[in-house]
């Protein structure tokens, strides 16, 4: 949000706002919320927005503290699965086997060799009253979850899956299609965890092969059929673990 809203004349919002560093959004939001309480202003939900790098990596400590201290803040992570603003470097949210500028593809390395960090599960483990996932491909689901999260007292968290054209090596006209394919193939799941209770908010009528999603993106173009099959098995096992298939 800092990147897209700092150029003139796009800096004016109709709500009070603060531009801060990528990694301290949760810390600043915690301070704002505490300040409002000290002024006797109750019932105001503070909203913080951060990218995946600023959330799952360099801002994790601040976010963990925010949730643990029970600040009345809605934190939204916009996850495009790498540090896209600074040059497509991998983050803890980069999926297994994806190419980035810091996980190049060669004879030894086949892109990112670590699994994507499950940030919603980490926040749920903090016993936040509401945790949800969303996708830019399903805006009505996202809007519904934002309204719900804003109405709940205490720390709430929404993790939004957001394709990036340059970073994912896709044409911008395919952004929404790719976002939907992530959900339809099971590579990204839409759910809520409310007071520890898991609820899948969208289940594809019939899950499509992960190849449909992977082959649309240049960051996965190096994958062999065997490697794609391995990813498919991982997703199948994940769905069984969720108990939704």
Map each language-model feature to its residues.
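Cofactor-binding active-site loop characterized by glycine-rich and histidine/acidic residues
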Residues: 1-75, 88, 92-98, 112
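Conserved thiamine diphosphate
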Residues: 41-42, 91-151
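Active-site lining segments that contact anionic ligands and/or coordinate catalytic metals
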Residues: 153-157, 188
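Short gly/pro/ser/thr-enriched loop/turn and capping motifs at secondary-structure boundaries
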Residues: 80-85, 165-167
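Short, conserved beta-strand edge motifs with alternating hydrophobic and charged residues
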Residues: 77, 131-134, 157-161
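Flexible, low-complexity linker and terminal segments
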Residues: 162-245
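Short, solvent-exposed amphipathic alpha-helical segments in soluble enzyme
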Residues: 63-66, 91-92, 147-151, 173-178
């Amino acid at each position: 949000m800092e990147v897209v809203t700092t150029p003139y004349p796009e800096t004016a919002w109709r709500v009070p706002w603060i531009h801060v560093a990528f990694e301290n959004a949760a810390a600043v939001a915690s301070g704002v919320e505490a300040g409002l309480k000290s002024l006797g202003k109750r019932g105001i939900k503070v909203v913080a927005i951060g990218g995946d790098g600023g959330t799952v990596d360099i801002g994790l400590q601040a976010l963990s503290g925010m949730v643990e201290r029970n600040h009345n803040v809605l934190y939204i992570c916009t996850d495009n699965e790498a540090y896209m603003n600074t040059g497509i470097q991998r983050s803890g949210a980069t999926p297994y086997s994806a190419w980035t500028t810091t996980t190049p593809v060669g004879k030894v390395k086949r892109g990112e060799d670590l699994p994507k960090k499950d940030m919603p599960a980490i926040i749920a483990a903090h016993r936040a009253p509401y945790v949800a996932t969303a996708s830019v491909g399903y805006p009505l689901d996202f809007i519904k979850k934002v309204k719900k999260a804003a109405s709940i007292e205490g720390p709430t968290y929404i993790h939004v899956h957001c394709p990036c054209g340059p970073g994912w090596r896709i044409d911008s006209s395919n952004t929404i299609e790719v976002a939907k394919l992530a959900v339809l193939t099971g590579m990204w799941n839409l759910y809520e965890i409310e007071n520890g209770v898991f609820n899948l908010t969208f289940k594809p009528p019939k899950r499509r092969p992960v190849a449909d999603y992977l082959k649309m993106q240049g960051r996965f173009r190096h994958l062999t059929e065997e490697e794609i099959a391995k990813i498919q098995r991982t997703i199948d096992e994940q769905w069984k673990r969720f108990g939704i298939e």
